């Protein structure tokens, strides 16, 4: 019987492999997955036996983003802000892990899933990986780490168009450290993490703190707080205010698949 936990953890030779485990939903992030991932991250951070971490996804994708299957409901602006602030805190906890964290990305890596990968220290992607942040097409956006990993023009191009890009394109932008053949991301990430696990732990932590301090001096953490508030404001607007009434009608009448097709059609290249 398959393990039903939304997050699986295996530790071998000092390397913890953390697997997002909702393959039937392309590992889309729901409340249960977020909570379990956060709990596991805290456990790993306190473990002396773990010297490096690999984050991956079960099945055909790393993570397709936030789980949209249940709709967003009609939450208040305050509730949305609290939710987004909690997500930001969880991303920062992953970023602040004392151990090096390597993301092993295959298949879809979109929206919140893309951000999850980019908050890791190093991203290894297989050639079939696809990255993107399509939320802009819904009248929203994600408070992103992308502007700290590439130049502002490229960040705006990706975030404004909502386009999906290949692993090779992501590497050219500085979002991915290494592209490996299809099916090879997890193996390559585990090999890299195995090498990192041999580092003196104090030295590895010092490097992480140093690079993190540079990003903080560039405003990363403060911008996440501002971005979370701005994203929550956008999410709290009505369909009429966002100008997406027709898309909402399509979703209500025809379902999520039809909604996504109608949303993305004007952006086809």
Where are these regions (language model features)?
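Charged catalytic carboxylate motif
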Residues: 32-36, 86, 93, 188, ...
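Terminal peptide-recognition signature
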Residues: 18, 22, 36-37, 55, ...
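Conserved CoA-thioester-binding segment of acyl-CoA-metabolizing enzymes
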Residues: 1-58
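Glycine- (often His-adjacent) and acidic-residue-rich active-site loop
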Residues: 49, 57-93, 109, 249-255
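A short, glycine- and basic residue-enriched loop/turn
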Residues: 23-26, 60, 65, 128-130, ...
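C-terminal alpha-helix plus adjacent terminal tail
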Residues: 1-13, 166-167, 187, 198-269
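Crotonase-fold acyl-CoA enzyme core
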Residues: 92-204
